[in-house]
Curated annotation (Swiss-Prot):
Domain annotation F-box: ranges: 8-54
InterPro entries per the UniProt record, alphabetical: At5g39450-like, F-box-like_dom_sf, F-box_dom
PANTHER family, per database record: F-BOX PROTEIN FAMILY-LIKE, OS08G0105100 PROTEIN
Bias (Low complexity) ranges: 320-332
Region (Disordered): 318-338
Organism placement in taxonomy: Eukaryota, Viridiplantae, Streptophyta, Embryophyta, Tracheophyta
Descriptive protein name: Probable F-box protein At5g39490
């Protein structure tokens, strides 16, 4: 008997419960490989108990929620597929440079879904950390179908109210760090009404990101205007289970979303079990038909003064003809040719979300970002470990005590800081990077390094105010931001980081005695308590990625401003 056959026989001799324990040391791909080894092994391996363990080992949901999610899906195997391929890669904090007060999108598990919620720049009451009251707004969600498939919805609004914009998930890479909103070309099968994704891009076809910025913006406008579905506010707010929501309501909402994704505006009169052979696909737009009787420039030639062609926007299509004439095509020719190539690559066009990996560079924990691209960037969140105790997301306000407001005021500006460890001149430092602030006008741009602390250098400075009842575990020497505006050339002054507990810090500027107090945050727990308020979403493009430089809070003051011109 050969070794492989002998090993298979040993596995078959194991009781199911014993194999389930062993399966904790196997990956989902290992389980799938065993299933392919034969019918006998499949009967042992491909069981609900085994896949339940695999769902646990993904480590994105507690066991209780895994069991609750199973009610709305065909099997734990299908659920594991959704957790591995969609939920785990997307969870975390995603950011953008603009507006400069902060653009933080927190992606977390919903109910048989993964949801993106924007944390709004805001002022908070003294008891905010105890009451967990924060303002947030829906950005997008990906729902899980009965078979483990997925469907994408972008949140937004038009003049009549809140909308959902159904679309496609165009791929999620395991280690993705860039999230892109795009218009995707689709090919119709000649034999039926089904839609299939192209197997590969033909040589010379232009991807969406290579179009001029204004063309991308107009295409997104066209598609969202045609696929948007109006919803009532409660449907727009119940993205995740809270203490106030019950399982019945969440199941009802999910059923509605699945219908909307499948049938579009006709969802109220349809059942999910129906084939739904519609004469059109509710998620797709026949842009080329719209352009048949109109010059395509009717849609695209607006705001020509804003067109910029970057080196990445050069076109393969023009390369041969231009080289033969030994002339360089103009920016207008490149732009027009790229647009024509893109529009010819599909019969219809839909909204797409793609999560991909790029080798990004960082400056003090903040990613270098591309302008004029509808992108969100993942901010690495390090878990607190023994040698990096203070890593992670922190929220706080200026002043002491932490819960006291200045005289005559009832609220203080909320700051979110990401704390990371780096090596600087052979020394280990703790960097506090600002990712959100709640002032009316920005004082420091998004991504500013608020302080740098030498974590191995104790501070001898005393705490500047009377705190007899407070015991400080440690204090470290460092420097905090002062004058200057920007990222790389800010002024700084000496300061100290005081550790009250591992979840409560205070940084003090030595000269001014100015102080910011910080508490460690768990946004999932805060949002699931349901005590915060949901701010209506903005125009769909603006709601995903705000592209204009601004020092104001665009997600509250301009939430009803539906004009999105750059």
């Amino acid at each position: 008997m050969n070794t492989e056959l002998f090993g298979a026989c040993l596995l078959l001799m194991l009781p199911e419960d014993i194999f389930v324990v062993i399966s904790r040391f196997l990956s989902p791909s290992d389980i799938c490989n065993l299933i392919l080894c034969g019918k006998s092994l499949r009967a042992l391996v491909d069981s609900e108990k085994t896949w339940l363990v695999q769902c646990e080992e993904v480590k994105v949901l507690p066991l209780l929620e895994i069991v609750q999610w199973r009610i709305g899906i065909s099997s734990y195997k299908a659920l594991c597929r959704f957790l591995v391929e969609v939920v785990k890669p997307l969870l975390g904090i995603w950011v953008q440079q603009n507006p400069e007060l902060g653009n933080v999108v927190y992606v977390m598990p919903g109910f048989l879904s993964v949801v993106g919620c924007r944390i709004i720049p805001q002022k908070v009451a003294p008891s905010w950390i105890q009451e967990d009251r924060v303002k947030w707004s829906p950005v997008f969600e990906i729902i899980c179908g009965f078979d483990g498939s997925n469907g994408f919805f972008l949140h937004g609004r038009d003049k009549e109210g809140s909308c959902l914009y159904p679309g496609f998930v165009m791929g999620i890479e395991k280690n993705c760090d860039v999230l892109q909103l795009e218009v995707v070309p689709r090919q119709e099968k000649s034999s039926c009404n089904e839609i299939e994704r192209g197997a590969s891009r033909k040589e010379g076809e232009i991807p969406f990101w290579m179009l001029a910025f204004s063309d991308r913006k107009h295409l997104l406008n066209i598609v969202t205007n045609h696929v948007g579905l109006h919803v009532v506010e409660p449907l727009n707010e119940m993205l995740f289970p809270t203490l106030k929501d019950d399982e019945v309501k969440l199941n009802e909402r999910r059923t509605i979303l699945l219908k909307m994704h499948k049938f579009g505006g006709n969802w109220k009169n349809m059942n999910l079990e129906e084939d739904g052979q519609l004469s059109y696909n509710p998620m797709q737009v026949k842009i080329n038909e719209m352009l048949e009787n109109l010059d395509d420039d009717f849609f695209f030639e607006l705001h020509e003064d804003l067109i910029e062609v970057t080196p990445t926007e050069s076109t393969y299509v023009l390369r041969k003809s231009s080289s033969s004439k030994n002339t360089t095509p103009s920016q207008s020719e490149i732009r027009h040719s790229n647009r024509k190539s893109f529009l010819s690559s599909g019969d219809t066009f839909g909204l797409g979300l793609k999560a991909s990996y790029t080798e990004m560079s960082y400056y003090k924990g903040w990613p270098d970002m591309y302008v004029h691209h509808f992108l969100l960037y993942k901010l690495p969140v390090k878990k607190a470990v023994d040698h990096e105790t203070y890593a992670g997301l922190w929220g706080g306000t200026f002043g002491w005590p932490a819960g006291k407001c200045p005289k005559g005021k009832t609220e203080k500006s909320l700051y979110l800081l990401m704390l990371t460890y780096e090596k600087e001149y052979s020394e280990r430092v703790l960097i506090g990077t600002k990712i959100l602030e709640g002032n009316r006008l920005v004082s420091r741009p998004n991504g500013t390094t608020m302080f740098v602390v030498k974590i191995d250098t104790p501070s001898l400075e005393p705490f500047p105010v009377d705190a007899d009842e407070i015991h400080f575990e440690n204090s470290y020497s460092g420097k905090g931001v002062t004058d200057g505006y920007g990222f790389r050339y800010l002024g700084s002054k000496p300061g100290s980081l005081f550790v009250i507990t591992n979840d409560f810090l205070a940084f003090v500027w030595k000269d001014t005695k100015t102080m910011i107090t910080l508490h460690r945050l768990n946004l999932t727990e805060i949002l699931k308590k349901g005590l915060g308020s949901c701010v209506p979403p903005s125009h769909p493009m603006k709601n995903f990625t705000y592209m204009r430089t601004s020092s104001m809070n665009e997600f509250t003051s301009s939430s009803t401003d539906l004009c999105y011109s750059d």
